Curated annotation (Swiss-Prot):
Annotated stretches, region: Disordered: 262-303, 330-352
GO biological process, one term: protein tetramerization
Subunit annotation: Binds DNA as a homotetramer.
Keyword Disulfide bond attached: no
Protein name: Cellular tumor antigen p53
Biased composition (Basic and acidic residues): 262-271
Sequence segments annotated as region (Transcription activation (acidic)): 1-48
Predominant localisation class: cytoplasm
Record's cofactor remark: Binds 1 zinc ion per subunit.
Organism: Oryzias latipes
Region spans: Oligomerization: 302-331
PTM sites of type Phosphoserine: S351
């Protein structure tokens, strides 16, 4: 083998090396014959083409690779909406009923019809009866969702507090509402709003009953820091089929240590704040009334007004003022009556 000559480091060195390389002429190359199974070669100018139909062996769709859509900022998620909290019985006349358990301190769950509010203990079962006027479509479900009641909190997602979440080991430990007594319960979290809900298939009532009972439990107290933090919540119970809402009912929920006591306290507070209903005589137009000035003053004095007072001390103070004014009015009327007594002789009677 001849030694490689030392070439100068320049642009022309590669050209000189390439010219020294020898290769056989094209005529000496062996090409496939016509009888070979691979096909025949046909000379066309300076090119050799294989004269064979490859349609049976060549997949012409090999380059038809589906193009996956690339996510861009122009693709927006579906719009989020504020949950509806108004009742909607729908064509199936959805109704909810709660067991009557009173306000005893020993009850674990009680419902106030006056306040449309459920009071229950932490992780205690609350039976809720569901009634419809006709059989829903096959595959219908009942969905329970918790939302905050007040407008300033409605955008926040209702979740359990970190303390109670860490004590639990189930996959849906962040969910506030759970369905008990059913292996078919499913827990969901909306990918856009992050709101959580639990569903259970609708089951027709048992023979001899008009109601279907579901068992709900609430896994966090209303006063838990880092969770509800004393913010009132609502439970939205919907009857759905394939994403379509057939009916909706809402009620407020308070999770506390003593449901009976809290229900009694809030109902009494509601009664105190509501003014007593009085019969009001319709008044005619003043232009049509022909009364004396004195009779008009008497009518004004008989008119009753109501206003709310906060605080027992302030109420007692205003009550004393009102009692004093009524006493002065009574004494004034008594004096006017005595001074107005005149005998038949025209002489004024002396008052004792």
């Amino acid at each position: 083998m001849d030694p490689v000559p030392d070439l100068p480091e320049s642009q022309g060195s590669f050209q000189e090396l390439w010219e020294t390389v020898s290769y056989p002429p094209l005529e000496t190359l062996s090409l496939p014959t016509v009888n070979e199974p691979t096909g025949s070669w046909v000379a066309t100018g300076d090119m050799f083409l294989l004269d064979q139909d490859l349609s049976g062996t060549f997949d012409d769709k090999i380059f038809d690779i589906p193009i996956e859509p690339v996510p861009t900022n122009e693709v927006n998620p579906p719009p989020t909406t504020v949950p509806v909290t108004t009742d909607y019985p729908g064509s199936y006349e959805l109704e909810l009923r709660f067991q009557k358990s009173g306000t005893a301190k020993s009850v674990t769950s009680t419902y106030s019809e006056t306040l449309n509010k459920l009071y229950c203990q932490l992780a205690k079962t609350s039976p809720i009866e569901v009634r419809v006027s006709k059989e829903p479509p096959k595959g219908a479900i009942l969905r329970a969702t918790a939302v905050y009641k007040k407008t300033e909190h409605v955008a926040d997602v209702v979740r359990r507090c970190p303390h109670h979440q860490n004590e639990d080991s189930v996959e849906h430990r962040s969910h506030l509402i759970r369905v008990e007594g059913s292996q078919l319960a499913q827990y969901f979290e909306d990918p856009y709003t992050k709101r959580q809900s639990v569903t259970v298939p609708y089951e027709p009532p048992q023979p001899g009953s008009e109601m279907t009972t579901i068992l709900l439990s609430y896994m966090c107290n209303s006063s838990c820091m880092g969770g509800m933090n004393r913010r009132p919540i609502l439970t939205i119970l919907t009857l759905e089929t394939e994403g379509l809402v057939l009916g909706r009912r809402c009620f407020e929920v308070r999770i506390c240590a003593c449901p009976g006591r809290d229900r009694k306290t809030e109902e009494e507070s509601r009664q105190k704040t509501q003014p007593k209903k009085r019969k009001v005589t319709p008044n005619t137009s003043s232009s049509k009334r022909k009364k004396s000035h004195s009779s008009g003053e008497e009518e004004d004095n008989r008119e009753v007004f109501h206003f709310e007072v906060y605080g027992r001390e302030r109420y007692e103070f205003l009550k004393k003022i009102n009692d004093g004014l009524e006493l002065l009015e009574k004494e004034s009327k008594s004096k006017n009556k005595d001074s107005g007594m005149v005998p038949s002789s025209g002489k004024k009677l002396k008052s004792n």
